[in-house]
């Protein structure tokens, strides 16, 4: 007899669970019923489980309220087979993405928890809800025909980057009953990612961001004619700010696609609507963003959104601006709404410029620092919660974002009072970071980046750091104005300068370090700056600062963006370099990452040889010396001296010992004898065969 296929018991499971919910007196909604306008719209926006557009329909959904009045969306998905509760990926997360960052519709459609987590991501992406309960229930009949069931309960939140965390094992859903729900939420709130889990989740999401940016830019490049690179940058930045929204007192609703009406009426064009939303957002943030800066941002966006009539002109009922806005929030919305502390706009900038026909010199100047290198520089500059960090060629503010994250993490670990931590966090963002960027479109990216990271944009200045900056705050805090002390008290300097500048960019280093009294500096620069192209600047720097380390970076560090060899130089500021001062020379050519340069690849950076441990070891070697050697050996690490009057001897490497040892002699003799014996045996074998 042919083998009978097992019949799904999904209808039985639906009856069972819906019966529970009814007995708990919960106001649940079935697949085709409406829960609320916000959730319905989000589910319609998202791709369906099969990959079509719209029509996400959880089998059951409800809003559960805790005793504080907070609503938690609960999304429930049913399946009818024994092995269809959940499928995890290689990192132990619920599998909803393929390896090339596409929605894994096969698993989303086949497994109950996977479908429920997929729906939860729609809510993170398109609503203000940040905490969602995803439930999967599957069942089967045992050999006696009795219905069995299994439940998976996951907490999906911006705190776990939308991947979800397993709450606990449950036999029913009585934890949703009003009298039990507070206890359940307490359990949910106690869930924390380990540092390793957090690191893996961030890394995975950052890979997804990179892939999404490739897709976004490819779409705009191919389908939206007439937009220059600057226009694209401004439109993307404007779309993100308009879509952010603000909760709490006097809330600002995020701009949605449906708010853009594609009207030709002056004052009601899509650009007018978007600009009003940006104005409302920035006005709400007025405590963090000075009025002068707000006006500059509004004027910049006004030029981008209103001057070009073509982007507001409806074609077939839709404006180009609405199309671009829709693409931005569809491709990127999830990532900036879950609050990733990454150099988001740095990734955006690098991807945008990846498609442009710049000369190599221009590319060398506009390339931005990878986030892991930015973090390396901030750690080498010994940044902590009390540091005052500045960057004289800030780009998209990626180095300042890295420094800010380290400062906030340090504050979080050392300040135990929530109120005091909140106060310190605001102080870090408002008064302890300063960046200067001369190019207007890149300056706007820096502003956007810091807004996304939490409003640390007050002292990002659109100035020439060499000719227009005297060391003062751009927007000084009130207490400094009262004391008439406007100087920014910098004690940490990070920099990736334009290499076409004088001395390959060492002119920036000379000025910045000359304005500091103490602290540390870490810069990444074309390595010829240390071997003759910046001799005079280097001599001057060493009159007031000590070179602590010279680190040779991988040749392919900026693959696809720039082809120059770079070094990182680390300084202690305020002490002149003496001829006997020890300098640590580190060959970091092998940093553990494998890089590729494929425009449409979802991942062009892979940790293939303990990269994270290598970066941590470099920081320790610079700080503590050769007793921290672990992965590296004395072939890559060398302690030597430089001549402070030379200025071109900063790129040394470990000397190669050419003097033969007795062991070398023995090995050579052994190799020779082995070769002779091999030949004798070969000849003897050939003779015996008559050859």
Task: Describe the function of each predicted region.
Residues 364-480, 488-495, 502, 518-519, ...:
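Conserved S-adenosyl-L-methionine
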Residues 15, 214, 230-238, 326, ...:
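Non-catalytic, well-ordered alpha-helical scaffold segments
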Residues 181-249:
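Non-catalytic accessory regions of SAM-dependent methyltransferases
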Residues 89-101, 207-227, 328-333:
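Short amphipathic alpha-helical segments and their helix-coil junctions
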Residues 25, 123, 381, 407, ...:
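Active-site catalytic pocket residues across diverse enzymes, especially alpha/beta-hydrolases
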Residues 237, 241, 245-357:
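Long recognition/docking surfaces used for binding and targeting
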Residues 1-133, 138-152:
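A short, conserved, highly charged catalytic patch centered on acidic carboxylates
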Residues 81-84, 107, 170-174, 178-181, ...:
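A conserved structural/catalytic subdomain of Rossmann-like adenosyl-cofactor enzymes
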């Amino acid at each position: 007899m042919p083998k009978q296929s097992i019949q799904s018991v999904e209808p039985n499971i639906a009856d069972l669970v819906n019966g529970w919910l009814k007995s708990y007196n919960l106001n649940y909604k079935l697949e085709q019923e409406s829960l609320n306008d916000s959730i319905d719209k989000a589910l319609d926006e998202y791709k369906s489980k099969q990959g079509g557009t719209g029509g996400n329909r959880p089998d059951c959904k409800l809003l559960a309220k805790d005793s504080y009045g907070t609503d938690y969306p609960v999304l429930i998905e049913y399946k009818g087979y024994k092995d269809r509760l959940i499928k995890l990926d290689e990192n132990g997360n619920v599998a909803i993405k393929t390896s090339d960052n596409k929605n894994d519709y096969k698993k989303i459609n086949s497994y109950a928890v996977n479908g429920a987590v997929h729906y939860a991501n729609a809510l993170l992406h398109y609503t203000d809800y940040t905490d969602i309960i995803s439930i999967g229930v599957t069942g089967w009949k045992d050999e006696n025909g009795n219905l069995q069931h299994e439940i998976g309960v996951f907490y999906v939140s911006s705190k776990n980057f939308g991947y979800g965390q397993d709450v606990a094992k449950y036999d029913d859903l009585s934890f949703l009953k009003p009298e039990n729900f507070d206890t359940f939420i307490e359990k949910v709130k106690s869930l924390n990612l380990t540092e390793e889990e957090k690191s893996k989740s961030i890394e995975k999401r950052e890979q997804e961001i990179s892939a999404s940016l490739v897709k976004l830019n490819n779409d705009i490049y191919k389908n939206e004619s007439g937009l220059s690179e600057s226009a694209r940058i401004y439109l993307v930045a404007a779309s993100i700010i308009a879509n952010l929204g603000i909760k709490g007192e006097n809330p600002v609703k995020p701009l949605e696609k449906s708010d853009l009406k594609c009207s030709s009426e002056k004052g009601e064009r899509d650009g007018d609507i978007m600009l009003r939303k940006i104005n409302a957002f920035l006005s709400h943030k007025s405590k963090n963003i000075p009025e002068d800066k707000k006006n500059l941002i509004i004027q910049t966006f006004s030029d981008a959104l209103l001057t070009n009539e073509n982007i507001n002109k409806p074609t077939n009922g839709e404006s180009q601006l609405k199309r671009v806005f829709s693409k931005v929030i569809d491709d990127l919305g999830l990532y900036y709404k879950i609050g990733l502390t990454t150099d988001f706009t740095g990734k955006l900038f690098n991807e945008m410029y990846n498609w442009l026909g710049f000369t190599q010199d221009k590319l060398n100047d506009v390339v931005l620092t990878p986030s892991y290198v930015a973090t390396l520089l901030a750690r080498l500059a010994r940044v902590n919660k009390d540091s005052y960090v500045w960057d004289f060629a800030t780009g998209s503010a990626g180095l300042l974002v890295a420094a800010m994250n380290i400062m906030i993490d340090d504050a979080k670990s050392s300040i135990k009072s929530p109120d005091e931590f909140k106060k310190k966090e605001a102080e870090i963002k408002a008064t302890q970071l300063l960046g200067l960027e001369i190019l207007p479109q890149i300056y706007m990216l820096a502003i956007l980046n810091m807004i996304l990271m939490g409003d640390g944009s007050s002292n990002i200045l659109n100035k020439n750091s060499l000719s227009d900056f005297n060391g003062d705050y751009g927007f000084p805090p009130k207490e400094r104005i009262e004391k008439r002390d406007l100087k920014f008290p910098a004690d940490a300097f990070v920099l990736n300068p334009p290499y076409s500048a004088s001395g390959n960019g060492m002119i920036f280093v000379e000025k910045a370090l000359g304005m500091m009294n103490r602290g540390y500096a870490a810069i990444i620069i074309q390595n010829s700056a240390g071997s003759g192209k910046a001799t005079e600047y280097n001599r001057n720097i060493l009159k007031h600062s000590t070179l602590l380390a010279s680190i040779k970076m991988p040749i392919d560090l900026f693959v696809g963006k720039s082809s120059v060899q770079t070094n990182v130089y680390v300084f202690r500021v305020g002490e002149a370099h003496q001829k006997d001062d020890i300098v640590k020379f580190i060959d970091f050519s092998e940093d553990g990452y494998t890089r590729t340069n494929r425009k449409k690849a979802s991942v062009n950076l892979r940790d293939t040889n303990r990269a994270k441990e290598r970066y941590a070891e470099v920081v320790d070697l610079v700080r503590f010396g050769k007793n921290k050697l672990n992965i590296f050996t004395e072939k890559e690490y060398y302690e030597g001296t430089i001549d402070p009057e030379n200025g071109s001897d900063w790129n040394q490497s470990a000397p190669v010992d050419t003097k033969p040892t007795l062991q070398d002699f023995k090995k050579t003799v052994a190799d020779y004898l082995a070769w002779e014996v091999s030949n004798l045996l070969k000849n003897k074998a050939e003779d015996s065969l008559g050859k």
